[in-house]
Structure formats: C-alpha cells, structure tokens
Amino acid sequence: MSNISKQEKFFKALSDKNRLRILKMLRKKFLCVCEITEVLQLATSTVSQHLSILNEAGFIIERKDGKWVNYVINPNPSDPRVSKMLTSLDFWISDDRIIIEDLQKVQIVDRNKICSR
C-alpha cells in the first residue's frame, strides 16, 4: 500500500463525528457492537462499518471473549501517529457536550440486556 493510501485511511477514520465518538468511548472501556449501537442510537450495520474503518486505520482492534467480540483501543499500533492522535483527541473534544453524554451512557449501558433483544 502506498504511503498516500495509508494517509488517506488514517484521516478518513477521523473524518466522521460518530467515529470520534466511538474512539472516545473506547478510551473509557472496551465495548461490543450492541453497546456502541445503544449509545450512538445508530443502526448496527452503520456502527459495524465505522468500526471496520477504525480497525483498518489501526485505531482499534477486536478481542474475542466467549460469545462477545469486544472492541478496544489498539494498545500497540504500528503507526505512532495513532497514539499521538488519540492523546490529542482527549484534549480537543473531551469537553464536548455530546462526548460527555456518551461517556455517561457508557457507564450504565448493560450488554446483557441490550444484546439479547
């Protein structure tokens, strides 16, 4: 993959407000698709697409835990800009009202209730 293609994937991952919201939530704790869908109030397919883009760009990874597939911030990204950007996002958008509300919802969302619907 060319360097410009890598750059495009990196910046595309950051170009959507819902992907930024997902990154902030995953900085707080690991989540499954159902939990993210519940907080964002988006279709599961839309959330899955956002997760795929973030995964391809190296921001997140999947971790299987029994029947759950959890999404977490990539602890060892191959691109050093990923960690730097996540730290910058903490500074830039942490005081955003929507982000604050998302993080409050993340604390009370119950995967056992919502994933069995």
Indicate residue ranges for each PLM-predicted region:
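Small-residue-rich alpha-helical segments with characteristic i,i+4
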Residues: 47-48, 63
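N-terminal intrinsically disordered/low-complexity leader segments
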Residues: 1-3
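Beta-hairpin "wing" of winged helix-turn-helix
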Residues: 56-65, 72-73
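Amphipathic alpha-helical dimerization/coiled-coil segments
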Residues: 78-117
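N-terminal helix-turn-helix DNA-binding core of bacterial DNA-binding proteins
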Residues: 5-46, 52, 68-78
